[in-house]
Amino acid sequence: MLTKAPRGTKDITPKDAYKWNYVENKFREICSLFGYEEMRTPVFEHTELFKRSVGDTTDIVQKEMYSFTDKGGRDITLKPEGTAGVVRACIENKLYADTQPTKLFYITPCFRYERPQAGRQRQFHQFGIEALGSDKPSLDAEVIALAVQFFTEVGLKDLAVSINSVGCPTCRAEYNARLKEYLDAKSDVLCETCLERKDKNPMRVIDCKNPTCKENLNDIPFMVDHICDDCKDHFEKLQTYLKEMDINFVVDKTIVRGLDYYKKTAFEIISNDIGSQSTVCGGGRYDGLVEQLGGPKGVSGIGFGLGAERLLLTMENNNIEIENPYATDIFIVTIGDEAKTKSFKLLKDLRTNHISAENDHLDRSVKAQFKYSDKINAKFTIVIGDDELANDTATLKNMSTSEQTTIKLSEIVQELKSRL
């Protein structure tokens, strides 16, 4: 067991790490284009933060959090999602007092105790953005546009954007009462989970994946059909802005998201990859969360989160290849101790000039050194032996053409800079 990673975790080895670097750097690039800056928060927070933000009745809080009491008697939780920690940090550091809106992005590991499956791990990696300080639908449109541009630029073409309005406290109270009345009349056909949800958070019943529930609740009332005039105006303007940017979308009345803090806009982005559909992103507006966590009143917010594991799996399913940028430029083959000693100055000169270079550390034969050079896909091999040392030269071999050139050691760096 000591040599096995814990269930639900996965090592990211060099054969995959470059793919992670690619999507992480692309996310940073796109966020920068939209004016978002990076935020880093601790990997663990006080448990109460997630109970108050994510919601006591959610599956995350009730079933999935990694929580413990530390040696100081504090209740601590490894973060199950990124938003709560960023909002907490904004309050603590008074970022809301800076130029509004405050636009942030993050890349972070998260932790949930759930059944591991393809694209879903107990330790997973979340990319996300949070924009605080504006309650306008134009910001909602920007957030969705950022996500769409990111997915498009990593190669996902067949995207489906689904949006919904989950109302505000004003219209939701009346709707929840109506929904609960409807669900009470259907109690005998609800699954066990929905029976619990109908009393604690009735709107979550809409999110049930149980086929029997879906069949028996086909006439369930939806929030978007009962929103107040303010929410309706907000939702209509959002749609106008998305159309202006040529972002295709559908209104999906069943989107409620799994977290309690969402208000007004909720959205998901689905990739129709080969053979199946995959939700690659979800988010929404969380007006009131800042105040709920102890911040000032009236600081609105919106954001989204996406799972890196699921994104990379979706890209793989779409046959999107990511080129490995890490290739060794030079391997130095040395013959004899004196040549090996001489190679270290050359290695330093090459690396100082940002030319990647390696040499042998296992005292291999010349043949084995060439074989290793080929294995690491070195572009050029430099050979230094007794003859070369006597003439202060080296043999430069182009590994793709097998062309060999004798060149002065003092000129080799400049020569390689011109060739690479």
Language model features with spans:
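TRNA-recognition modules of translation machinery and tRNA-sensing kinases, especially anticodon-binding
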Residues: 1-367, 372-420
